[in-house]
């Protein structure tokens, strides 16, 4: 006849989950085959795990309390159960076991530690700043770690205790027949911990609101719409939880001269009709400052595009630059001096192909309507 599971663990039928777990860890440590040479250690260890397998689960425990071992006989006959204690959650069982036995290992974090929220900051910079890179100081308000209690939420020198009602998980379970209902622990309000003497500065939250100043490094070649992540610079976590992150979204202010196209820059370059006809050199401003000479070919037409290689935007983590593309806009003077008009009239008379061009133009127009 199988031994009563409560007797195996040495607990009463009204024992809490925390008491059941505590008893299990103590016995598992005592009878684990690797820690004792007792001849019946393996048998005892299997019995302990079988008992804990049922009693740690509220639904299985309710069925056991009502029907005893018969509640699991059919399941075992179908091959659906295994009371050896080695068939599931090995890491969870031995994680807690070796944590207590060896003084190390993983532990589940209580719900009192909550990660801080991420923050978003919109930063507008000039085109020249995007080209060269710059360090910007920004100011914003957020939750910061309390310097009085170091984020614990408890008054200095006071200890924070695990809630004995929920065992530190922040929720309690209510058994109703075969159903288990979970609800927020009324004693710790879901925090999993009890702060008997809350910090006066942060009122037990482990953080408080403050205006912050932060230096942001903008790399050279940053593009419009780039998002820069600053890990751990978001809001402080609650009661020692990890900080959130800060995301800085970059917007580049429209420039009076240049328009951005990836790493290339476009600009409108006005020239006189004399320069367009005769050609020559003209100085144009560049993004890094100063001016460079641009060669205008003779006969340049309005709307032509001339390229200055490697005079565009810098690229992040690269020595390669984009190009600068100048869009020619030929300006025709609206007011002419007497001498300028005479010269243009003379040029008009001496135009060799003027008549042919006119004849060609009118012939084409005539053919369109014939």
Swiss-Prot record:
Keyword Cytoplasm (UniProt): yes
PANTHER family with a match to the protein in the record: DNAJ HOMOLOG 1, MITOCHONDRIAL-RELATED
Family: Belongs to the DnaJ family.
Signal sequence, start to end: none
Xref: PROSITE patterns: DNAJ_1 (PS00636), DNAJ_2 (PS50076), ZF_CR (PS51188)
Cellular compartments per GO CC: cytoplasm
Gene Ontology terms for molecular function: ATP binding; heat shock protein binding; unfolded protein binding; zinc ion binding
Main location: cytoplasm
Domain J: 4-68
Subcellular location(s) of the protein: Cytoplasm
Name of the coding gene: dnaJ
Annotated source species: Rickettsia typhi (strain ATCC VR-144 / Wilmington)
Zn finger limits (CR-type): 133-211
Database matches in CDD domains: DnaJ, DnaJ_C, DnaJ_zf
Binding-site residues, Zn(2+) 2: 163, 166, 185, 188
Domain of life: Bacteria
Keyword Chaperone assigned: yes
InterPro entries: DnaJ, DnaJ_C, DnaJ_domain, DnaJ_domain_CS, HSP40/DnaJ_pept-bd, HSP_DnaJ_Cys-rich_dom, HSP_DnaJ_Cys-rich_dom_sf, J_dom_sf
Protein's recorded name: Chaperone protein DnaJ
Gene Ontology annotations of biological process type: chaperone cofactor-dependent protein refolding; DNA replication; protein refolding; response to heat
Residue sites binding Zn(2+) 1 per the record: 146, 149, 199, 202
One Pfam family recorded for the sequence: DnaJ_CXXCXGXG
Assembly and oligomerization: Homodimer.
Cofactor, how bound (note): Binds 2 Zn(2+) ions per monomer.
Comment, domains: The J domain is necessary and sufficient to stimulate DnaK ATPase activity. Zinc center 1 plays an important role in the autonomous, DnaK-independent chaperone activity of DnaJ. Zinc center 2 is essential for interaction with DnaK and for DnaJ activity.
């Amino acid at each position: 006849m199988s031994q009563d599971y409560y007797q195996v663990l040495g607990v009463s039928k009204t024992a809490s989950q925390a008491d059941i777990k505590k008893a299990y860890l103590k016995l598992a440590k005592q009878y684990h085959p690797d820690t004792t040479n007792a001849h019946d250690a393996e048998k005892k260890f299997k019995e302990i795990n079988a008992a804990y397998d049922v009693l740690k689960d509220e639904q299985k425990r309710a069925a056991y309390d009502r029907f005893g071992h018969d509640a699991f006989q059919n399941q075992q006959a179908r091959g659906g159960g295994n009371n050896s204690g080695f068939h599931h959650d090995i890491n969870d069982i031995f994680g807690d076991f070796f944590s207590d036995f060896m003084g190390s290992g993983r532990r589940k974090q209580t719900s009192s530690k909550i990660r801080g929220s991420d923050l978003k900051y919109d930063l507008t910079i000039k085109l020249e700043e995007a080209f060269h890179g710059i360090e910007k100081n920004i100011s914003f308000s957020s939750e910061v770690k309390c310097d009085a209690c170091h984020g614990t939420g408890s008054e200095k020198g006071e200890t924070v205790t695990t809630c004995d009602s929920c065992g530190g998980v922040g929720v309690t379970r209510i058994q109703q027949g075969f159903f288990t209902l979970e609800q927020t622990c009324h004693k710790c309000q879901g925090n999993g911990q009890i702060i008997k003497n809350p910090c006066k500065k942060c009122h037990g939250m482990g953080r408080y609101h403050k205006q912050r100043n932060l230096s942001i490094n903008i790399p050279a070649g940053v593009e419009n719409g780039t998002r820069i992540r600053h890990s751990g610079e978001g809001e402080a976590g609650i009661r020692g939880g990890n900080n959130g992150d800060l995301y800085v979204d970059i917007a580049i202010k429209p420039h009076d001269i240049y328009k951005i196209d990836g790493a290339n820059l476009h600009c409108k370059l006005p020239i006189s009709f004399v320069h367009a006809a005769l050609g020559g050199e003209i100085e144009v401003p560049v993004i890094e400052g100063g001016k460079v000479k641009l060669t205008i070919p003779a006969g340049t037409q309005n709307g032509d595009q001339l390229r200055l290689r490697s005079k565009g935007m810098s690229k992040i983590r690269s020595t390669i630059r984009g190009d600068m593309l100048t869009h020619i806009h030929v300006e025709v003077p609206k007011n002419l001096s007497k001498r300028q008009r005479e010269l243009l009239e003379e040029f008009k008379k001496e135009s060799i192909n003027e008549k042919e061009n006119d004849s060609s133009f009118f012939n084409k127009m005539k053919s369109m309507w014939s």
